[in-house]
Amino acid sequence: MNVYTPDIDKLPNRDEAATALATLRAWAQTASAAEIETLDPSVARLLPGDPSDYPSLARAYPEEFSVDAAYKDSLPDLQNGPSSLIRGAKAQIQHVGISNFRLPIRFHTRDNGDVTLETSVTGSVSLEAEKKGINMSRIMRTFYGHADETFSFEVIERTLDAYKSDLESFDARIQMRFSFPMKVESLRSGLSGYQYYDIALEVVDVNGQRRKFMHLDYVYSSTCPCSLELSEHARQFRGQLATPHSQRSVARVSVELTCGADDCLWFEDLVELCREAIPTETQVMVKREDEQAFAELNAANPIFVEDAARSFCLALQRDDRIGDFRVVASHQESLHSHDAVSVLTEGPTFASDSLDPRLFQTLFHVG
């Protein structure tokens, strides 16, 4: 006699599961609460309507609710959790924090007392390999603790000390970015107007060494020396009117400051160093006589992008308040469909074998 033994380990398919679910739901609709509890309390969730063990939640915002110390202590704090919560490799993170939180900040200036400017702040700290994360709101709270002061590098350093302590980190960094106004005279008409310079101040504390940096975007006109000579050749040999091509150009000048409070490098000082290197800065207020003067100034100072980098370099080398530096220049060509670019560094601070793929795309003056 043959005896057939079914495969008891076979998993049910979807149709079999649906049939079993319908059977269980039909039984639950006629069973008592005690019977359901005896079988499995979760069966109650198969019944229509609200599950019996699901809480009724308030939907109105509790305006009168206040947080006391006990409630605050009960709140989960995942970022300060154990290292077992870390996802990915247990590796040190060099910078973690917040970027582009904005607030009005008052700054010292060389020529016009104190000015209040909208400032974008980036604050970050290092994170040890065994720590889950940081409480990022502490960076903002710490910064706001100093926000009413008139900022200088000394105030930035005190702020840095505070949030290194608050976040219990070894390394830290603050960068403050703003648009700084300076009144600029026209070339010949006697008019004046405000030129705005994108400036960033940065304090970095790594391995117990603290360093201060200033970054400036300087916008100027560059006339191509080759195009100038070719235009003159057409005029001289063929009597043909021709104009050289020139274009708006941007140099991002980053300098490490070695000076102290008594001999600081002011915002205005760095602008003037750049203007000394390349005098064809774009103009603010322009009448006809100023436009003619600007054409003459460009003709007297034709410049390739290589010349621009080296001209800035010479001006920066001559200032004892400046240590390492970097110049990134972009001539946004009116002749070509591409730009001409150059990068010059002095000292190890800014030296790099690799460049941010979008570095030169950030060198645009958008007005």
Curated annotation (Swiss-Prot):
Annotated keywords: Hydrolase
Tagged with keyword Signal: no
Reaction(s) the record says it catalyses: GTP + H2O = 7,8-dihydroneopterin 3'-triphosphate + formate + H(+)
Signal peptide residues on this chain, from the entry's feature table: none
Highest taxon in the source lineage: Bacteria
UniProt pathway annotation: Cofactor biosynthesis; 7,8-dihydroneopterin triphosphate biosynthesis; 7,8-dihydroneopterin triphosphate from GTP: step 1/1
Enzyme Commission numbers on file: 3.5.4.16
Pfam family, one: GCHY-1
One GO BP annotation of this record: tetrahydrofolate biosynthetic process
Annotated site, May be catalytically important, chain positions: C224
GO molecular function, one term: GTP cyclohydrolase I activity
Keyword Magnesium found: no
HAMAP family: GTP_cyclohydrol_B
Function text: Converts GTP to 7,8-dihydroneopterin triphosphate.
Family, similarity comment: Belongs to the GTP cyclohydrolase IV family.
Protein's name in the database: GTP cyclohydrolase FolE2
Species this protein is from: Dinoroseobacter shibae (strain DSM 16493 / NCIMB 14021 / DFL 12)
